[in-house]
């Protein structure tokens, strides 16, 4: 065992490719000096020259850089225990090439205009750089050999550990392995930091993590194998862990030498959906002049069919809801038809310079159908993520519990469930990657998913061993280590998937799923089905906990302020109040069902707390989306269902959302509503003009005015069937938010009014505040907007004109009052400062600072169309004699 195995390198010293930052940094000074010596500009500048360096100085710089490298090389050669002969030969070669460069450079500096001498210097410089590079690569190979020697030492101890015969030897060998792992990890980390290739750095980092994770597992499994050598599953676990350690050692060995490791498996078809849709959108825009059916039709149809195949795989997945499956199929058929229509229009326009209107319409329709398909795919993927990552550890806990009780007959069934659970998590993680553009996040997701796939059979083997020997402490310890490892990896995967998933999409889908689960709870309670009640309640708790966790993590990425405080207030209310109340009511209901005393239970209380948990989730989502742009809100609203799940507590929630009903109003009512909205927008533009000049970082009045304006705009959008508000309850909640903002503005403005010494100004400000209070109350009353169905002459006619008109009018009046309040607050603030500054001003309630102008580039950027503009001939320049200029000079007039 003492004899060391000779280390063989797979690095070619003649290959001059620089792989490390260290070699690159050492070469840089010499490259600069040599380049300065031999470089000659092809087009000399017409500006005045500075004094150039003498040739002797340039030569001395090259020699100094070379001798510095030679000194370092000689020290390395003296200390090296390997490659001594190669290093010595390389040093001699560098000296020889350095002398050759010196001779040719002296000849060149004597006659710098003679081309053959210049070419000789260039050749000598290249030869010197090649020799120095070879020397540095040899020095780098010594570092690699040192690392490989530690890999070999770890390998020998690792082989000894696999074959130990008793626990005493096991403990000694494992302690030795731990020390060697520490040394190996240190050298591997240094090599990882020095490598230029990002892929090789990632490979070494992954291998180091694998060694640290699997070494303790190997010790535990070996200990269990010594006690229970007859358990086949323990031997299988040991073989798997040994294989993982061996693979990690191979990766470190290959990556440190710059050798490519095993090729990554090809991406699944679904993983290319996002990029394939992007490519299709780019390829459908063609020039009719150059279009030929033989070229474009087969290629576009082939690309579309590949996309549809990937979408079909997603639609057929077990986690995809029936509704989304049908919609994906419908969108696939629609986009297929849109492509055929587009191709037909291209053929009709072939040879024409400009596109016809029908062709432009077909293009727009194709783009719309592409977006619709992408939207349905996003819905389905978010559904998968929301469902699959709900209870990530439950199948493992069930498997371990069965193993602890020694139920060998049931263990295979639970193992199959656990394996299916792992496969689903990996599948959903890959699906989440398919529509994401976060490359780093996708890489982390795939690494974490691969770890889970590798870990799954090991955990099943450990559970089988525990079921065979349920009283063995060594086997229990092994199972516990695997459990912790699984939990760590599942946590990493969950966080990684959350990072590449839009929080807005996740919250929209989670809100819909919680509403489904709430309805299931109520049905189960009324059907006296305890199992389904417990299952649905558990899903609600899990989804609510996931929402709280993800939103809390999202808020950590923002600076603390009013926005984060508002969001976290709702999250804390959910976790500290609503969920405990819900759990209490569920336990009461389950106890009543178990005792068959349901007639004593007040189910209305259960319905109320169920609705409360849904409303709180909705409030969290609304507060998160407070800072979103209108475009982002419109995109998220597309994710919401166009129908509402029927509530089992009221018959009135059946059918479409209140917002959707607004789009079905008669055209005459729509025109009148549009007139009211136009008047509202005029007032909104006044408010925008009033508040956009002020910096809102230290002015809460401006912040509140902006907030009220945004919410009122959402309410008016609701009356047109648009925007983020879906139901009348959302509009009522929005009116409540406006009322709260108005109350906060009232407090601030009254403080300003109390400090204002001008009685007329103070009186006007207080009057506008009373208007805000009045119109806020009026808006709350008018917020019960709903489309009523009337039966006229046997025809069903929807109408909502009165309530909509009242709502918009109240919003317009309130916005007018806000405009006047902002104006008068500023005027009152200026009077406070002007009058009281001689005696020392009071601390201002808010700071009225003008907003800094938007940054503009110092240099005007050229537009693409300007760079390709036609070049025109300039006017001829007329030379004027200096004497003529002097004769025309009159001087400055003195008055």
From Swiss-Prot:
Gene3D superfamilies: 6.10.250.2510, Alpha-catenin/vinculin-like. Transmembrane segments: none annotated. GO terms for cellular component: adherens junction; cytoplasm; cytoskeleton; desmosome; fascia adherens; lamellipodium. The keyword Zinc-finger does not apply. Keywords: Cardiomyopathy, Cell adhesion, Cell junction, Coiled coil, Cytoplasm, Cytoskeleton, Disease variant, Phosphoprotein. GO terms for molecular function: actin filament binding; beta-catenin binding; cadherin binding. The modification Phosphothreonine is found at residue 649. The modification Phosphoserine is found at residues 56, 160, 637, 647. Residues 74-111, 325-379 form a coiled coil. It is found in: Cytoplasm, Cytoskeleton; Cell junction, Desmosome. Interacts with CTNNB1. Interacts with PKP2. Belongs to the vinculin/alpha-catenin family. May be involved in formation of stretch-resistant cell-cell adhesion complexes. It is linked to Arrhythmogenic right ventricular dysplasia, familial, 13: A congenital heart disease characterized by infiltration of adipose and fibrous tissue into the right ventricle and loss of myocardial cells, resulting in ventricular and supraventricular arrhythmias. PANTHER family: ALPHA CATENIN (PTHR18914), CATENIN ALPHA-3 (PTHR18914:SF21). This is Catenin alpha-3. The lineage of its organism: Eukaryota, Metazoa, Chordata, Craniata, Vertebrata. The gene is CTNNA3.
């Amino acid at each position: 065992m003492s004899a060391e195995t000779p280390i063989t390198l797979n690095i070619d010293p003649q290959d001059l490719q620089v792989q490390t930052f260290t070699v690159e940094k050492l070469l840089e000074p010499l490259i600069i000096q040599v380049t300065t010596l031999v470089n000659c500009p092809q087009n000399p500048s017409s500006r005045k020259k500075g004094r150039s360096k003498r040739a002797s100085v340039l030569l001395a710089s090259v020699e100094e850089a070379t001798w510095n490298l030679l000194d370092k090389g000689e020290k390395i050669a003296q200390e090296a225990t390997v490659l001594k002969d190669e290093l010595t030969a390389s040093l001699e070669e560098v000296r020889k090439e350095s002398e050759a460069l010196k001779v040719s450079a002296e000849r060149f500096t004597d006659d710098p205009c003679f081309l053959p001498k210049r070419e000789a210097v260039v050749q000598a410089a290249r030869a010197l750089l090649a020799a120095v590079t070879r020397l540095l690569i040899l020095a780098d190979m010594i570092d690699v050999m040192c690392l490989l020697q530690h890999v070999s030492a770890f390998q020998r101890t690792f082989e000894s550990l696999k074959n130990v015969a008793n626990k005493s030897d096991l403990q000694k060998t494992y302690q030795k392995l731990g020390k060697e792992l520490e040394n190996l990890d240190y050298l591997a980390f240094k090599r990882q930091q020095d490598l230029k290739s990002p892929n090789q750095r990632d490979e070494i980092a992954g291998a180091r993590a694998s060694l640290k994770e699997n070494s303790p597992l190997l010790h535990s499994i070996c200990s269990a194998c010594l006690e229970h050598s007859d358990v086949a599953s323990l031997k299988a676990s040991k073989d798997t862990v040994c294989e993982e350690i061996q693979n990690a050692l191979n990766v470190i060995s290959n990556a440190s030498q710059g050798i490519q490791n095993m090729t990554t498996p090809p991406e699944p078809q679904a993983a290319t959906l996002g990029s394939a849709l992007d490519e299709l959108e780019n390829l459908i825009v063609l020039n009719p002049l150059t279009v030929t059916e033989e070229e474009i039709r087969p290629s576009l149809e082939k690309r579309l069919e590949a996309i549809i195949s990937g979408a079909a795989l997603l639609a057929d997945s077990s986690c995809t809801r029936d509704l989304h499956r049908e919609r994906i199929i419908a969108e696939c058929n629609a986009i297929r038809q849109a492509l055929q229509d587009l191709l037909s229009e291209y053929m009709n326009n072939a040879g024409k310079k400009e596109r016809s209107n029908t062709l432009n319409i077909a293009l727009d329709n194709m783009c719309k159908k592409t977006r619709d398909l992408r939207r349905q795919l996003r819905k389905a993927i978010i559904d998968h993520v929301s469902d699959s990552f709900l209870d990530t550890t439950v199948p493992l806990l069930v498997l371990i519990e069965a193993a602890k009780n020694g139920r060998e007959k049931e263990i295979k069934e639970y193992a199959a469930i656990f394996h299916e659970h792992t496969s689903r998590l990996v599948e959903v993680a890959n699906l989440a990657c398919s529509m994401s553009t976060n490359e780093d996040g996708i890489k982390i997701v795939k690494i974490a998913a691969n770890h889970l796939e590798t870990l799954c059979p090991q955990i099943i083997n450990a559970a089988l061993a525990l079921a065979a020997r349920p009283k063995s402490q060594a086997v229990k310890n092994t199972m516990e280590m695997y459990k912790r490892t699984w939990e760590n990896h599942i946590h990493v995967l969950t966080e990684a998937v959350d990072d590449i998933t839009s929080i807005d999409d996740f919250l929209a889908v989670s809100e819909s799923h919680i509403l489904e689960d709430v309805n299931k709870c109520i049905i189960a309670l009324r059907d006296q089905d305890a199992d389904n009640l417990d299952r649905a309640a558990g899903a609600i708790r899990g989804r609510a906990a996931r929402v709280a966790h993800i939103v809390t993590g999202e808020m950590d990425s923002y600076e603390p302020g009013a926005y984060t405080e508002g969001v976290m207030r709702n999250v804390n209310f959910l976790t500290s109040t609503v969920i405990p109340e819900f759990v209490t009511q569920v336990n009461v209901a389950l106890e009543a069902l178990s005792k068959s005393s349901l007639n004593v239970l007040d189910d209305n209380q259960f319905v109320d707390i169920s609705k409360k948990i849904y409303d709180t989730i909705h409030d969290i989502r609304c507060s998160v989306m407070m800072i979103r742009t209108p475009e982002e809100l419109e995109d998220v609203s597309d994710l919401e269902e166009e129908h509402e799940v029927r509530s089992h507590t009221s018959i009135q929630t059946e059918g479409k959302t209140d917002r959707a009903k607004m789009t079905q109003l008669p055209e005459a009512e729509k025109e009148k509503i549009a007139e009211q909205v136009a008047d509202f927008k005029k007032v909104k533009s006044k408010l925008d003009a009033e508040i956009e000049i002020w910096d809102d970082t230290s002015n809460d009045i401006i912040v509140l005015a902006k907030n009220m304006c945004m919410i009122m705009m959402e309410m008016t959008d609701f009356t047109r069937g648009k925007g983020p508000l879906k139901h009348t309850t959302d509009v009522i909640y929005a009116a409540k938010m406006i009322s709260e903002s108005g109350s906060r503005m009232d407090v601030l403005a009254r403080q300003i009014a109390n400090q204002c010494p001008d009685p007329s100004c103070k009186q006007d400000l207080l009057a506008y505040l009373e208007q805000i209070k009045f119109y806020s109350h009026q808006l709350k009353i008018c917020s019960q907007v709903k489309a009523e169905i009337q039966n006229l002459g046997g025809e069903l006619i929807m109408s909502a004109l009165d309530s909509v008109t009242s709502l918009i009018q109240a919003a317009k009046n309130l916005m007018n009052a806000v405009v006047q309040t902002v104006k008068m607050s500023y005027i009152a603030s200026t009077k406070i400062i002007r009058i009281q500054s001689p005696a020392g001003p009071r601390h201002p309630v808010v700071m009225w600072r003008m907003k800094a102008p938007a940054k503009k580039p110092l240099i005007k950027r050229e537009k693409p169309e300007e760079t390709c503009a036609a070049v025109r001939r300039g006017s001829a320049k007329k030379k004027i004699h200096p004497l003529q200029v002097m004769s025309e000079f009159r001087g400055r007039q003195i008055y």
